[in-house]
Amino acid sequence: MSTVYVVGLGPGAGEQMTVRAEKILEACPVILGYTVYIDLVREQYPEKKFLSTPMKQEVKRCQMAFEEAVKGQDVAMVCSGDAGVYGMAGLIYEVGREYPEIKIEIIPGITAATGGAAVLGAPLMHDFAVISLSDLLTPWEQIEERLEAAAKAGFVICLYNCLLYT
């Protein structure tokens, strides 16, 4: 049985990738992901088969991963940060319903929120909120409500996808 691994690469620097992520990338003959994330690992694994798609083709990317796995190959789907925090883990599980013969395994990584907090010297020691500013899947009005509620409650707020709004 082939496996699709969803691998969190961490917040961008190679040394922030987990040992488990490195082992999975080393073991899988196929590495697939968003073009920018593939560029982060291509040089380190030159013998691998690389497949990529641009932004906004996440479903297609997941389908490609399963199509490769159906051929009998283990596949590493790479994401930035942690695969389960604004990553591809949820979508892989959704698309994976169509491929019950393929195993799915999530390989967590260091989130951008915790990585950024460490760089800034601002550890997330108490309750905090993580909110994406992307309105691709969430209406902007709902994002605003979440921001207001988190601020009113006194949470430290870690924002994702800020570049969309600068």
Spans of model-derived segments:
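Class I SAM-dependent methyltransferase SAM-binding "motif I" and its flanking Rossmann-like core
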Residues: 85-153
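Class I S-adenosyl-L-methionine
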Residues: 1-104, 115
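Conserved small/polar residues in nucleotide/adenosyl-binding loops
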Residues: 165-166
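Internal catalytic or translocation cores that form aromatic/hydrophobic pockets or channels
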Residues: 160-161
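Ordered, small/hydrophobic-rich secondary-structure cores
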Residues: 155-157
